[in-house]
Curated annotation (Swiss-Prot):
Protein name as it appears in the record: UPF0284 protein cce_1085
Classification via NCBIfam families: nicotinate mononucleotide-dependent phosphoribosyltransferase CobT (TIGR00303), PRK04447.1-6 (NF003373)
Matches recorded under InterPro entries: Nict_dMeBzImd_PRibTrfase, Nict_dMeBzImd_PRibTrfase_arc, Nict_dMeBzImd_PRibTrfase_sf
UniProt similarity note: Belongs to the UPF0284 family.
Gene Ontology molecular function, alphabetical: nicotinate-nucleotide-dimethylbenzimidazole phosphoribosyltransferase activity
Highest taxon of source: Bacteria
Native species: Crocosphaera subtropica (strain ATCC 51142 / BH68)
Length: 369
C-alpha cells in the first residue's frame, strides 16, 4: 500500500530493518508570516484563518472528535484537513504522540513540549529568525531526537510538521542549498503557485544579501534568513535519532527540504547523523502531482528514499475526501507517513485505512452538527 519512488535499494533496506517495529509519532508545529500572504496557501480559506490552522490541527491530532474545540478546524476552500488521515491511524494503532511547539503566535490548547522558539517573520524580509535562536532550536532538536530514540529503542520515529506557507520556505531552503527546485515543489493548491513562490523567495534572497544563483549557503544562516522554526528542529531531531533508529520525515516538499538541510549540516559541521536511517514519507497526491515534480526534486537532493502511500479517495463516500484526487490539500500533519506506517507496521489494507478515515469524518460531522 506504499511505493518507493527513489533510492529503491536504500528504501528497501529501511523497510527490512523497521517493518517489524511500531512507530512513535512526533509533530513539530510552527508558523511563518509567509503563510499570511494572500493566495500563498489553501490551508485555511483566509489569511486570518491560516493563523490558527496549526493550532487547530494540533488540537484535533491530540483530542480527536469532540463536541467543541478551543480552535475548530478552519474551513478550507475545498477538501478537509489531512489531520483526519493522521488521527485515524494514531488513534486506532495506539501510536504515542509527541507535540512540539517550535514557534507559534498562539500556543496550542492541548499538552505540548515548548521548544522556546518564535514565529518566523515573512521570508521576504530576509530576516526570518534570529541566528542565535536557530542554533538553540537545533540543539533542542538534537536533544529531543536523542531522547525519543533512547526511550523507544524498538520503534522508529515519524517526524511530521504543520506549518502554513511551509512549501514556500522549503523552496527558499532548497534554493539556498544549491538545489534547483524551480517548478518542482508542491502546494496545497490544486495547481501549484510556482511563480508567486519564486518571486517571494527572490525577494527574500535579495533582502538577505544573497545572490539567487544556486550557490550553497551556510545552513544555519540560511534558515535564519529565509526559513521557518520547524525546519531546523526536525533537522536536529533526525540527525541525533538516526544514530540509534529509523526516522521517517513525514511530509512532501517540506521534508525534502529538511532532508537537504540535514545533508548540508552533516557535510559542513561537526554534527554526525546516519543518512541510511532516514527516509521521506508522503502521499501519492504529492509524489504524483503533475503541477510539481517531487521525484526529480528528490533525485536532485541525492540518495533520499522517497516513499508514498498509495491511499486513494476516488471511491470515498465523502466529497471532501474525493477533492484530494483533484489535487486539493495533498498532505500535512504527517498524513502520508502515518498511512505508510499503517501498512508497514500494522498490516492495514487500503480498504481498512479508508474505512477508518471515513468513520472519523462521519463522527466529526455527526457530533459537530
Amino acid at each position: 500500500m506504499f511505493r518507493i519512488y527513489t533510492a529503491h535499494s536504500l528504501g528497501q533496506k529501511w523497510v527490512e530493518n523497521y517493518q517489524e517495529c511500531s512507530a512513535i509519532f512526533a509533530c513539530i508545529v510552527g508558523f511563518t508570516e509567509t503563510g499570511l500572504i494572500p493566495g500563498i496557501s489553501a490551508a485555511g480559506a483566509t489569511p486570518e484563518a491560516r493563523k490558527y490552522t496549526a493550532i487547530a490541527d494540533a488540537e484535533f491530532l491530540i483530542n480527536g472528535v469532540q463536541s467543541s474545540y478551543h480552535y475548530p478546524l478552519p474551513p478550507l476552500s475545498q477538501g478537509v484537513s489531512p489531520v483526519f488521515i493522521t488521527r485515524a491511524v494514531v488513534e486506532a494503532c495506539n501510536i504515542p504522540i509527541y507535540l512540539f511547539n517550535a514557534g507559534l503566535p498562539t500556543p496550542p490548547s492541548v499538552p505540548y513540549i515548548d521548544l522556546k522558539g518564535k514565529s518566523a517573520n515573512c521570508l521576504t524580509t530576509g530576516k526570518a529568525l534570529p541566528l542565535p535562536l536557530v542554533y538553540e532550536l537545533f540543539q533542542q532538536g538534537l536533544k529531543w531526537g536523542k531522547k525519543l530514540a533512547k526511550d523507544h529503542t524498538k520503534n522508529y520515529l515519524i517526524l511530521s510538521e504543520c506549518v502554513v506557507g511551509g512549501t514556500t520556505t522549503a523552496l527558499s531552503i532548497l534554493t539556498g542549498l544549491g538545489i534547483n527546485a524551480t517548478e518542482k515543489v508542491n502546494s496545497s493548491h490544486p495547481h501549484c503557485n510556482h511563480k508567486q513562490k519564486e518571486l517571494i523567495v527572490k525577494e527574500g534572497f535579495k533582502n538577505a544579501g544573497y545572490s539567487y544563483n544556486l550557490k550553497p549557503i551556510n545552513p544555519f544562516e540560511l534558515v535564519a534568513a529565509v526559513g521557518d522554526p520547524m525546519q531546523i528542529v526536525v533537522a536536529g531531531m533526525a540527525i541525533s535519532a538516526s544514530l540509534k533508529t529509523g526516522v521517517m520525515l513525514a511530509g512532501g516538499t517540506q521534508m525534502l527540504a529538511v532532508y537537504a538541510l540535514i545533508k548540508s549540516i552533516i557535510n559542513t559541521s561537526k554534527y554526525q547523523g546516519n543518512l541510511d536511517n532516514i527516509i521521506v514519507g508522503t502521499t501519492r497526491w504529492v509524489a504524483e502531482d503533475l503541477t510539481g515534480d517531487t521525484v526529480t526534486l528528490a533525485e536532485s537532493i541525492g540518495t533520499v528514499p522517497l516513499f508514498a502511500t498509495q491511499l486513494n479517495f476516488s471511491s470515498s463516500s465523502y466529497q471532501q475526501l474525493q477533492m484530494y484526487e483533484q489535487g486539493y490539500v495533498k498532505e500535512g500533519v504527517g498524513a502520508g507517513g502515518c498511512a505508510i506506517a499503517a501498512s508497514l507496521s500494522y498490516n492495514w489494507t487500503q480498504e481498512k485505512l479508508l474505512n477508518r478515515i471515513e468513520n472519523l469524518v462521519n463522527n466529526y460531522h455527526r457530533i459537530r452538527n
